[in-house]
Amino acid sequence: MEFNFIINKLVQLDQQGLGVYIPRASRSKVSSQQEQQLGQVLNTMGERSAIAQGLKQVITNYDKVQGTDQRVYIVAEGRTCQGFLKVGQKNLFYRDMMGNIKEIKPLCVLDFYVHESCQRQGYGKLLFEYMIQCEQTSPEKLAYDRPSPKLIAFLKKHYNLVKYIAQNNNFVVFDQYFRSDASSQNKQNQNTRSYSQPYSDYSSQIPTNYPQQQQQQSNSKSYPYKQENNIDLMQHSSSRNNKEFLNAGRAILSKEEIYKKDNLSQQNIENTLNNINNSQYSTKSQQQQQYQKDYQLDKYENNWGADKNIKKPPFPGQDRQLDKIQQKIQQTERELDVVNQQIIKQRQNLSQDPLTQNHRAQNVYNTNQFGTSPWAQTGFNYYSTSSSNYGNHYTYYKK
């Protein structure tokens, strides 16, 4: 963004064109004309930043910066201002994943803008690194006020900052903020030694002619399990040179104890074998082996089909199939029993119905009075009925 005046006269810049504007410190040193020019720079850049971020209100303004501890970092060259970055401390209430609220006071990035004509040329990273160096902090120790998608992508690309928990105050605090606190405390608690001289210089100070007896005494005092009384030597028979190994203070077993352990181990083996033989799985495997010996499947499969009278022997697993078939048969029998019971209940209900009782009584009366019709036993296929005072009259017809 170009202006009609030189920005170097308003803010002290270094060789790379980087500088910082601190309102409290620089207000007394700046004239009224320079204040107007600074206000013009901050107002125009703040408006462009709000338009680029799609904000309804302008965040950065010359009047808003005055009377605060905020700092505005600027990158400029001559009459052009490439971008700015505004920071300041804020008291924030942070809610974690468990719902716990913490009060923190981090340094916050309040506004960050690089002109469209200067983007993707390294000005943003240069300005951000300059701010970190001046504030003596790191990117994960910062809080970001309403960061735009471009700023989030910038932090992910250059500083690997991705994970954060959304807050009601629209500030973004990355998870590394709290991890860095824990790591810094751990570093302070650790008792580390730093030697300015190389290791070779220290090794030259160690005495070479150290008495051997004193070394043994010191080892026995500091490490009691290395004393001579508690050390047992045993020769390794498989080693070529008959090397001697330390038993680490353990007493060597006698022959009787070794025999006892061997007997116990043999008893345990016998018990396990008996358990295996008595188990149901072992019996099934034995049955399969006996089946292979008795029926000789290879010979049987070769002769199968030559003599149809030979019955196919039972194969392994046939018992399971028979069990399944029996279960299905039992299930169908149960279903038939249920159906029969339902039929019996329906018959009982019909017998108790008054309509069916009247119908049966009328039929009994007709048969007793007139007798059965001889035509019913003939080859007539259908008939018609007509009622009268004497009962039902049947008229039979042929096809």
UniProtKB/Swiss-Prot annotation:
It catalyses: L-lysyl-[alpha-tubulin] + acetyl-CoA = N(6)-acetyl-L-lysyl-[alpha-tubulin] + CoA + H(+). Residues 194-223 have a biased composition (Low complexity). Keywords: Acyltransferase, Transferase. Residues 183-193 have a biased composition (Polar residues). It comes from the Eukaryota. One of its GO terms (molecular function) is tubulin N-acetyltransferase activity. Residues 1-178 form the N-acetyltransferase domain. Specifically acetylates 'Lys-40' in alpha-tubulin on the lumenal side of microtubules. Promotes microtubule destabilization and accelerates microtubule dynamics; this activity may be independent of acetylation activity. Acetylates alpha-tubulin with a slow enzymatic rate, due to a catalytic site that is not optimized for acetyl transfer. Enters the microtubule through each end and diffuses quickly throughout the lumen of microtubules. One of its GO terms (cellular component) is microtubule. Transmembrane segments: none annotated. Belongs to the acetyltransferase ATAT1 family. Residues 183-223 are annotated as: Disordered. Pfam families: Acetyltransf_16. CDD domains: NAT_SF. The record marks Q53 as: Crucial for catalytic activity. Acetyl-CoA binds at residues 112-125, 148-157. This is Alpha-tubulin N-acetyltransferase. The lineage of its organism: Eukaryota, Sar, Alveolata, Ciliophora, Intramacronucleata. GO terms for biological process: regulation of microtubule cytoskeleton organization. Its EC number is 2.3.1.108. The keyword Acyltransferase applies. InterPro entries: Acyl_CoA_acyltransferase, Atat, GNAT_ATAT.
